[in-house]
Amino acid sequence: MMRLPWFEHRAPKSVQEAARILAGEGPNAMLIAGGTDLLPNMKRRQMAPKVLISLRHVSELKRNGSALGAGTTLTEIVNKKELPLGLRQAAHQVATVHLRNMGTIGGNLCLDTRCNYYNQNYEWRKAIDFCLKKDGEICWVATASKRCVAASSTDCAPALMALGARVKLVAASGEREVALEDLYNNDGIDYLKRRPDEILTEVSIPSGWNSTYWKLRRRGAFDFPVLGVGAAIRFSGDTVEEARIALGAVASRPFLVEKASEFLKGKKLTDEVIEEASRLVASRAKPMDNADLDLYWRKDVTAAFATHALRELRGDDMSEARLRIARQLV
């Protein structure tokens, strides 16, 4: 049986109280909201904080007005029909109902990167002399690399990135707001630009976008993404006024595919335009051999998933494909 390591549990009632505790405890502390990813990681000794600062009782993080509180659960997002469709689709494809009831949007955006050599129990990792991400000196995926190439595993980030979302980060010393795409580094270890003393408190989502999210995973019932495509378009009639396409799970960070987004501007979504845009999207996918399914196939299938996304935004009936791939029709 894998047991949790000993830790001290703190339960602040406000963001500022949580920020003060976080600043005071320094590297010994970690934040916990739903804990659906953190607690299993702790059982595998991938993380061993001495202090856990719970955000479950911080009511400020659950408010939803002009911005989405970081403590909003994924189930609540799925059920909020006024939220963008792409975000709701992404949230609905995370894990299972029970985990979505616990997991939060803030937690999903800050989700740890994943790798077949890292997401194993302690004894398994010890047998291979650990890895660069935790306790070792070698990246077993790219042995010549000095950078960890563990892959981003968040579903909601590509969907929100396509929507032009921004996030607020609060520390005891002050607060700042950044575009979501500026929250991430392309590094499997140092994957967040959020400072250790900062708390992600809310997500601001611009309006006026048509959006969608398509996810590839090994198990149809539930699994982490091995590819995520988030797409959003503003139309003027049937012409693309503005477009944003983001990829997830094919690098250590989710990222925008700017060439494809620029290519779509001012064009109608004809089959030929969709094919070329999808080719541009696929050209930016560079998955590593650190997740389920063959990496070359994952790269090749990126174009098909981008095509599904753009066809759905064009208004095509993609329900059959979505049921086959995503097992849902949100």
Question: What does each of the following model-derived ranges do?
Answer:
Residues M1-V330:
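C-terminal structural segment of proteins
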